[in-house]
C-alpha cells in the first residue's frame, strides 16, 4: 500500500466525488452561522443542517467538502486529551459527501468502497463494516453487491438504553431527521490489542473507524416513533487525520506527514530534539486551532469563544515554557502552517501576517506573568502535595492568567488533583466582592493631580489632544510600550466616560506609528476621563500629541439606545403612572436595560402601548435639543430629575420628543435616527422594582427577524400557516392532554391486570404472604395503586414492587395493617434500596425508595423472602 500525503488525500477525495457529479462546497467558518446552539463547527454537516431540516434550498443535490472543525468548548471538548493520546485533536478536518434527496445507500456505500480500495488502495481484507440491526438493505449491499464476507459485516443493536439508541443510529436531535448509519473500520491486524466493533474489547486500537455513512430516511416523533422521510438524504464523514494515519501506515495521527512537519517546526522553535515529546504534539495541534480561529474572527478574550481561544493558546505557550521557551515562539509557526495548509484554505494564507501578529500579542501578554505563576504553582506543590488548593488555582487564574484546565493539565503531569470546587467558590466570592465594591474601584485608586479633561464628544468624534498622564498596573508612568495595558489621560477628548448608565466609548488613540486601542473610558475624577486599553504598536509618552478617534458605529448604536431610553421612560409614566421613577439603567451598543419603580408586572397590553408610543415619536422624526442651564431653571422647566442623584449648579437638559430630562449622555440628532424600538424582556429585579430590556435600530430588526424565523419554524413543524398557528397549537395541546388521560387509564388497567398475575407468586412465611416483583413500565403512582390492590387481596402480607427506567430503580414496600408490628415497610424498602444504590422511607405500612443500580435489582428482590423470614 503506497504512502500518500495529506494534501493528496484531500485532493483525491474531492476529485473522486466531483467525478460522481458532486459540487465542491468550501469549508464553512469555525463559528457556525446557522446554529446558535453550537460554540464551534464540529462536523461537516453543520453547514448543511438547514438543508436537512428543509429550511434551506441549495442549487445542487450532491455536495462534497473538506470541513475545518474544532472540538474544544461546550460538550464537544477534547482539549485535555490533546497531546496525551494518538488521535485527539482540537482542530481537525472532516471529509464528507452529501446527497439531498438524490442518491441513497447503494451509491453511498459502493462509492465509499471504490474510493477506499481502488483510489486509496486499502487492502479489502483489512476492511469491515457495521450496520444498524434492522438495516437489511445496507447489510445486503455490503454482502451481496460489494462482496464483503458476512462475518465482516456486523449488525449493531440498540446498545445505548432504548429503541433507536445505538452507535449505528444517528439522530440530529430528540426529534426530527434520523436514520441508520454504516461505519467502515480498518483492521490494523492481530498484533494490535482490541476487538471488533460490538465486542467487549472494541475500544482497543486494532479496529479503527475511518468512515461513517449516515442514511437520513426517517423522521422521529416526540413519542419515539419513526416515519419515512419523503426525500432520504446521505451524510458521510471521514476524519482526514485518521484516514491519513491508516494510508501512511502509522498508528498515531501525530506521525502523519502534516504533523511530522508541524512537529519539526515546533522542535526548531523550542529546541526540543525528541520529536515524540508530548509538548511538541500539543504545540503542533494548537497552532492549527489558534490560527484557524483567528482566521475566522475569534480573538483571544475573557469569555465565550474568545476564552476558548485563549485557553488553547496558553496551553501551547505553557508547553513551550516547559521546553525552555521564555519568549514568544508560537506565532513563528504560522508561516509553516500556511505553507502546509494555505493552498486548501486560502483565507489562512491571506491573513498570515494578521494571524501571526495576534498570536504574538497574546504570547507577550501571557509571558509577562507565566514565570511568576509557575513559581506559585511549584511552591504550592512542594512537599508532595496531592491536591492543589482551590484558592491557589483561582489566584493563578485571576492574577496570572492561568485557565483552570491549564493548571489541571500541569497538575495531572505530577499526579496531583485540583480542588475545582474550591476554585469555583473563590471565583464566586470575587464576583460578589466586585459587585459590592462597584466598577470604579481601580479608577478611584489612580492618583491624578493634573487638570481636567475637556470633553468634546458632543460635537466631534475625533480630534487632537495631548497626553497629560499615563498609568500602568495602577501606577503613574512616563511612557507606555508595545503590548502594555494602561490608562491614558488627555487634556481634551471626544471619548464619553461611563456615567448615567451609558457605557464608555471605545476607539483608537494614535501618534505616528503608536496605536492605543481604547477598550473602555471611565472617570478617574468627575472631570477627568481615563482611557483604558492596550498599546498595540509603538511607544507613547506623557506630553505626546495624539489623535483620538471614537468608534463611530458603537457610539451611534449606543446613542440610539440612550435616546430611546428617554422616550421609554416618558411612555412608562404615561402608561403606568407618574409613580414610575428610574432606579437604574445600562445603555450600550446592543441594548438598553431600564430599572424602574413599579409594584406589578407590566402586562402585554401595557408593553404594546409603550412600544406604540415610543415608535410614534420615532416616526415623528423630531429634532432633539440639549441645553445647559442652572439647576433652578431646569427644575422650573419641568425637567425630570432623579431624587437620589446629586447635581451641580449647572446641568444639561435634554429635550427629545415629549421627554425632558437632565442628562449628560450622548444622543441622536433626531428621533427618527433611532429607527425602530422593541421591548425584548420585562421582569422583576427586587421588591417594587421592574426591569425592561429593549433594542433599537438594526438590533431591533435582527430581533424581529429571529422571532419571525422561530414562528415560521413552529408553523413548519406543525404544518400550518402562521395565521393558524395558535389554533393548531391549542389542538395539539388538547390532543396531548387527551393522550395523557388515556395513558393514565391504561396504566391503571395494566396495574390491575398485573396485580392479579402477581398474586400467584406470593409465598407464605409463618402466616405472612411475601411478594417481591418488578412491574414493567410502571411509575410511582402505578406502583402505589398496585400495592393497594395486592394488600387488599392478600390480607396479611409484606410486599415489594419495583420499576426500572434505564439504570434507575423505583421501589415501593407495603405491609398490611395487621402485620406492621412484625415488619416495618420503611425497614423493608431500605433493605432492598441499599442493594441497588439508594435509600428511602415512609410510613410503617407504605414506603418508597429509589436506586441507581438496576443491575442489582433481581438479586435484591430475591433476598426479600429471606430477610422477612429472619425478622419473624
Swiss-Prot record:
Disulfide bonds: none annotated. It catalyses: tRNA(Ala) + L-alanine + ATP = L-alanyl-tRNA(Ala) + AMP + diphosphate. One of its GO terms (biological process) is alanyl-tRNA aminoacylation. Signal peptide: none annotated. InterPro entries: aa-tRNA-synth_II/BPL/LPL (IPR045864), Ala-tRNA-lgiase_IIc (IPR002318), Ala-tRNA-ligase_IIc_anticod-bd (IPR018162), Ala-tRNA-synth_IIc_core (IPR018165), Ala-tRNA-synth_IIc_N (IPR018164), Ala-tRNA_ligase (IPR050058), Ala_tRNA_ligase_euk/bac (IPR023033), DHHA1_dom (IPR003156). Its main location: cytoplasm. The keyword DNA damage does not apply. The keyword Ligase applies. Binds 1 zinc ion per subunit. Its EC number is 6.1.1.7. It is found in: Cytoplasm. Keywords: Aminoacyl-tRNA synthetase, ATP-binding, Cytoplasm, Ligase, Metal-binding, Nucleotide-binding, Protein biosynthesis, RNA-binding, tRNA-binding, Zinc. Coiled coil: none annotated. Its cofactor is Zn(2+). GO terms for cellular component: cytosol. It is an enzyme of class 6 (ligase). PROSITE patterns: AA_TRNA_LIGASE_II_ALA (PS50860). Belongs to the class-II aminoacyl-tRNA synthetase family. Catalyzes the attachment of alanine to tRNA(Ala) in a two-step reaction: alanine is first activated by ATP to form Ala-AMP and then transferred to the acceptor end of tRNA(Ala). Also edits incorrectly charged Ser-tRNA(Ala) and Gly-tRNA(Ala) via its editing domain. Consists of three domains; the N-terminal catalytic domain, the editing domain and the C-terminal C-Ala domain. The editing domain removes incorrectly charged amino acids, while the C-Ala domain, along with tRNA(Ala), serves as a bridge to cooperatively bring together the editing and aminoacylation centers thus stimulating deacylation of misacylated tRNAs. This is Alanine--tRNA ligase.
Amino acid at each position: 500500500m503506497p504512502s500518500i500525503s495529506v494534501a493528496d488525500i484531500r485532493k483525491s477525495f474531492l476529485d473522486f466525488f466531483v467525478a460522481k457529479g458532486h459540487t465542491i462546497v468550501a469549508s464553512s467558518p469555525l463559528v457556525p452561522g446557522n446554529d446558535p446552539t453550537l460554540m464551534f463547527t464540529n462536523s461537516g454537516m453543520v453547514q448543511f443542517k438547514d438543508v436537512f431540516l428543509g429550511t434551506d434550498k441549495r442549487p445542487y443535490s450532491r455536495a462534497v467538502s473538506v470541513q475545518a472543525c474544532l472540538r474544544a468548548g461546550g460538550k464537544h471538548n477534547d482539549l485535555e486529551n490533546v497531546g496525551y493520546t494518538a488521535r485527539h485533536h482540537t482542530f481537525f478536518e472532516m471529509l464528507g459527501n452529501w446527497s439531498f434527496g438524490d442518491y441513497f445507500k447503494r451509491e453511498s456505500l459502493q462509492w465509499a468502497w471504490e474510493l477506499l480500495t481502488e483510489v486509496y488502495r486499502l487492502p479489502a481484507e483489512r476492511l469491515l463494516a457495521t450496520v444498524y440491526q434492522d438495516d437489511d438493505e445496507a447489510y445486503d449491499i455490503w454482502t451481496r453487491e460489494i462482496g464483503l464476507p458476512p462475518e465482516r459485516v456486523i449488525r449493531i443493536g440498540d446498545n445505548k438504553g432504548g429503541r433507536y439508541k445505538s452507535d449505528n443510529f444517528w439522530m440530529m436531535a430528540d426529534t426530527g431527521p434520523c436514520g441508520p448509519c454504516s461505519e467502515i473500520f480498518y483492521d490494523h491486524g492481530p498484533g494490535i490489542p482490541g476487538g471488533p466493533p460490538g465486542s467487549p474489547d472494541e475500544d482497543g486500537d486494532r479496529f479503527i473507524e475511518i468512515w461513517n455513512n449516515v442514511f437520513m430516511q426517517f423522521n422521529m416523533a416526540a413519542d419515539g416513533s419513526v416515519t419515512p422521510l419523503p426525500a432520504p438524504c446521505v451524510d458521510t464523514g471521514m476524519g482526514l487525520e485518521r484516514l491519513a494515519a491508516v494510508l501512511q501506515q502509522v498508528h498515531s495521527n501525530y506521525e502523519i506527514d502534516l504533523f511530522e512537519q508541524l512537529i519539526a517546526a515546533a522542535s526548531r522553535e523550542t529546541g526540543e530534539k525528541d520529536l515524540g515529546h508530548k509538548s511538541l504534539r500539543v504545540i503542533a495541534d494548537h497552532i492549527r486551532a489558534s490560527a484557524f480561529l483567528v482566521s475566522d474572527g475569534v480573538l483571544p478574550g475573557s469569555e465565550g469563544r474568545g476564552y476558548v481561544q485563549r485557553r488553547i493558546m496558553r496551553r501551547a505557550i505553557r508547553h513551550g515554557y516547559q521546553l525552555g521557551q521564555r519568549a514568544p515562539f508560537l506565532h513563528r509557526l504560522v508561516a509553516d502552517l500556511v505553507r502546509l495548509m494555505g493552498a486548501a484554505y486560502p483565507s489562512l494564507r491571506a491573513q498570515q501576517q494578521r494571524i501571526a501578529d495576534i498570536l504574538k500579542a497574546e504570547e507577550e501578554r501571557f509571558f509577562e506573568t507565566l514565570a511568576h505563576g509557575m513559581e506559585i504553582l511549584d511552591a504550592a506543590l512542594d512537599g508532595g502535595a496531592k491536591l492543589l488548593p482551590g484558592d491557589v488555582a483561582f489566584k493563578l487564574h485571576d492574577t496570572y492568567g492561568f485557565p483552570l484546565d491549564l493548571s489541571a493539565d500541569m497538575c495531572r503531569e505530577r499526579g496531583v488533583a485540583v480542588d475545582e470546587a474550591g476554585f469555583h467558590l473563590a471565583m464566586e466570592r470575587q464576583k460578589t466582592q466586585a459587585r459590592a465594591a462597584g466598577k470604579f474601584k481601580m479608577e478611584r485608586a489612580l492618583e491624578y493631580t493634573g487638570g481636567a479633561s475637556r470633553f468634546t464628544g458632543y460635537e466631534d468624534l475625533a480630534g487632537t489632544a495631548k497626553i497629560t498622564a499615563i498609568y500602568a498596573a495602577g501606577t503613574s508612568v512616563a511612557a507606555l510600550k508595545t503590548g502594555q495595558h494602561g490608562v491614558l489621560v488627555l487634556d481634551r477628548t471626544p471619548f464619553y466616560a461611563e456615567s448615567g448608565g451609558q457605557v464608555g466609548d471605545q476607539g483608537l488613540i494614535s501618534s505616528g506609528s503608536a496605536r492605543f486601542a481604547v477598550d473602555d473610558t471611565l472617570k478617574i475624577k468627575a472631570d477627568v476621563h481615563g482611557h483604558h486599553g492596550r498599546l498595540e504598536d509603538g511607544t507613547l509618552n506623557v506630553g505626546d500629541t495624539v489623535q483620538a478617534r471614537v468608534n463611530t458605529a458603537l457610539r451611534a448604536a449606543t446613542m440610539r439606545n440612550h435616546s430611546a431610553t428617554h422616550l421609554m421612560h416618558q411612555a412608562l409614566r404615561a402608561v403606568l403612572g407618574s409613580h414610575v421613577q428610574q432606579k437604574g439603567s445600562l445603555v450600550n451598543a446592543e441594548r438598553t436595560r431600564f430599572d424602574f419603580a413599579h409594584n406589578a408586572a407590566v402586562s402585554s397590553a401595557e408593553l404594546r402601548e409603550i412600544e406604540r408610543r415610543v415608535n410614534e415619536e420615532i416616526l415623528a422624526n423630531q429634532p432633539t435639543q440639549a441645553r445647559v442651564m442652572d439647576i433652578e431653571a431646569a427644575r422650573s422647566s419641568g425637567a425630570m430629575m432623579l431624587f437620589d442623584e446629586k447635581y451641580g449648579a449647572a446641568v444639561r437638559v435634554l429635550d427629545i420628543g415629549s421627554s425632558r430630562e437632565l442628562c449628560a449622555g450622548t444622543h441622536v440628532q433626531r428621533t427618527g435616527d433611532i429607527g425602530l424600538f422593541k421591548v425584548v424582556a420585562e421582569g422583576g429585579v427586587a421588591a417594587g422594582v421592574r426591569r425592561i430590556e429593549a433594542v433599537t435600530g438594526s438590533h431591533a430588526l435582527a430581533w424581529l427577524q429571529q422571532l419571525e424565523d422561530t414562528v415560521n419554524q413552529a408553523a413548519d413543524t406543525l404544518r400550518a400557516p402562521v395565521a393558524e398557528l395558535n389554533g393548531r397549537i391549542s389542538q395539539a395541546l388538547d390532543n396531548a392532554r387527551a393522550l395523557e388521560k388515556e395513558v393514565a387509564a391504561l396504566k391503571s388497567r395494566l396495574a390491575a391486570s398485573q396485580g392479579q398475575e402477581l398474586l400467584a407468586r406470593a409465598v407464605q412465611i409463618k402466616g405472612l404472604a411475601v411478594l417481591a416483583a418488578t412491574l414493567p413500565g410502571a411509575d410511582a403512582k402505578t406502583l402505589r395503586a398496585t400495592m393497594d390492590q395486592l394488600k387488599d387481596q392478600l390480607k396479611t402480607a409484606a410486599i415489594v414492587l419495583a420499576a426500572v427506567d434505564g439504570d434507575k430503580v423505583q421501589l415501593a414496600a407495603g405491609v398490611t395493617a395487621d402485620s406492621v408490628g412484625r415488619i416495618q415497610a420503611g425497614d423493608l424498602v431500605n433493605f432492598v434500596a441499599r442493594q441497588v444504590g439508594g435509600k428511602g422511607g415512609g410510613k410503617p405500612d407504605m414506603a418508597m425508595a429509589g436506586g441507581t443500580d438496576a443491575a442489582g435489582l433481581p438479586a435484591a428482590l430475591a433476598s426479600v423472602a429471606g430477610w422477612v423470614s429472619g425478622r419473624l
